[in-house]
């Protein structure tokens, strides 16, 4: 007998956990459209108020992966996702998108999962499209792009068609729900390593442990103390690192890597055009905090991808890829390849 939505709602009201198998059953019902919009909204609200557990998040992510259109990557060596939950309210330029090109040029292979803007001035999909790349690639085309360029951008609506069922509910609710933290956990290419930014410090340890439950090999989950969902230059950054099946939590600072502190307001943009201008300036090796934060985050991605021995080594590799022009070339190669794939 399936786990009833009414029982799920009752559990959340009483601040009791929904167990893994029950949550899998419930999420399948929701994703199939078997649960009414009103009941779905009530359950999502109850989970948020109660605070979602590691098992509840892992179970929900497992089902979203089940329903996703997977990208058939033949070789996942050094394959990493660089992703953020968004919702940090910082309105910075597309740091993780820029880091994607840098990390790929420095030896990683990046399968980045993203969407258009919801809370930011420019979502990752908006940025990749504004750079001239085709974003609406089918799974086999994404796999081909990864094979040819070391980069694959996966536009979330294409890979998660079942999300159409809950989209109207989420839109009408207008508040964060479990789905805001599920997106970064449901990479359609099943990248074995991930650099993930989160919007709340509590999620640093939680998401690292959820990734472990989901079988991720290496991960860094980060939250900047200035409320950035990236490794920050403006404050310390809390890290939950998953390695060898263990989660270690610690804090890093830009000075640890010889980088001057810089407030996040120096990285703010008013829209996609400004974001793209800042991204291109970084790839043109223009010195400043924008280049520093991209190199640091790309360096961390190179570390979790197994390309670099530590973040410092990754940072040096990232800076070299920017300085020698290979990151800029990789961007152009990706743009040209995606256009050819959809032609």
UniProtKB/Swiss-Prot annotation:
GO biological process, any: L-tryptophan biosynthetic process
A GO MF label: magnesium ion binding
Residues that hold anthranilate 2 according to the record: 170
GO CC aspect terms: cytosol
Keyword field: Amino-acid biosynthesis, Aromatic amino acid biosynthesis, Glycosyltransferase, Magnesium, Metal-binding, Transferase, Tryptophan biosynthesis
EC number: 2.4.2.18
A Pfam family assignment: Glycos_trans_3N
Ligand binding (anthranilate 1): 84, 115
InterPro entries: Anthranilate_Pribosyl_Tfrase, Glycosyl_Trfase_fam3, Glycosyl_Trfase_fam3_N_dom, Glycosyl_Trfase_fam3_N_dom_sf, Nuc_phospho_transferase
Superkingdom: Bacteria
Keyword Ligase: no
Binding positions (5-phospho-alpha-D-ribose 1-diphosphate): 84, 87-88, 92, 94-97, 112-120, 124
Residues annotated as binding Mg(2+) 2: 229-230
Cofactors required: Mg(2+)
Chain sites annotated for binding Mg(2+) 1: 96, 230
Pathway: Amino-acid biosynthesis; L-tryptophan biosynthesis; L-tryptophan from chorismate: step 2/5
Cofactor binding: number and manner: Binds 2 magnesium ions per monomer.
Coiled-coil ranges from the UniProt annotation: none
Isomerase recorded as keyword: no
Reactions catalysed according to its record: N-(5-phospho-beta-D-ribosyl)anthranilate + diphosphate = 5-phospho-alpha-D-ribose 1-diphosphate + anthranilate
Function description: Catalyzes the transfer of the phosphoribosyl group of 5-phosphorylribose-1-pyrophosphate (PRPP) to anthranilate to yield N-(5'-phosphoribosyl)-anthranilate (PRA).
Subunit structure, interactors included: Homodimer.
Stored PANTHER family: ANTHRANILATE PHOSPHORIBOSYLTRANSFERASE (PTHR43285:SF2)
Family to which the UniProt record says this protein belongs: Belongs to the anthranilate phosphoribosyltransferase family.
Protein's recorded name: Anthranilate phosphoribosyltransferase
